[in-house]
A protein has these predicted regions:
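Bacterial N-terminal signal peptides that target proteins for export
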Residues: 1-9
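Non-globular, low-confidence helical/coil segments that flank catalytic cores
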Residues: 2-3, 18, 22-167
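Bacterial N-terminal signal peptides
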Residues: 9-18
Length: 167
């Protein structure tokens, strides 16, 4: 438990520092932050690297979206279908380039599809010790135009985490 809290605190510190300009670690420190995004805005993913350990903060948009045939996941205006904000391939390529074999944790800042989208793919591809995310509720979204496919992505994460035994 103490190790997980330390990891979470480290992730929080890295995240806070990322809002104050460029963060640079000494070459010998073994600590790096890798930012992956699309130039047009929207989808982001952050890989934290520390002495051979890896974690992620947000995972970017994925290729999956509901088609509206399931009443739990209605078609909504604003669901990204053009793939211009998808980070699945970039995240996968970057993790491979870094030699990642396992993720200590994935921290999702909020459950919009452009932050949670690739969690299920990562859980299916890599061993992950823990996923940190808030319980989803449409009530937290004050602008109905931003409901998108958030619940769909959230449910996919829960299903894949349960299948992989990740809490």
């Amino acid at each position: 438990m103490k190790k997980k809290l330390t990891s979470l605190a480290l992730a929080g510190a890295f995240l806070c520092l990322s809002f104050h300009g460029n963060v640079q670690a000494q070459e010998s420190s073994g600590n790096k932050i890798h930012f992956i995004n699309v130039q047009e805005g929207g989808s982001d993913a952050i890989i934290l690297e520390s002495n051979g350990h890896f974690a992620m903060v947000d995972t970017g948009e994925d290729y999956d979206f509901p088609d509206g045939s399931d009443s739990r996941y209605p078609w909504r205006e604003g669901i990204e279908t053009s793939y211009k904000h998808v980070l699945t391939d970039r995240v996968s390529r970057h993790l491979k380039e870094l030699g990642v074999q396992k993720l200590d944790f994935i921290l999702v800042t909020h459950t919009h599809s452009d932050h949670i989208g690739n969690v299920d793919e990562l859980l299916s591809t890599y061993p992950v010790d823990r996923v940190y995310l808030k319980k989803y509720s449409d009530n937290r979204i004050t602008n109905s135009e931003r409901l998108w496919d958030n619940l769909y992505g959230y449910d996919k994460v829960l299903q894949t985490a349960a299948e992989k035994g990740v809490s």
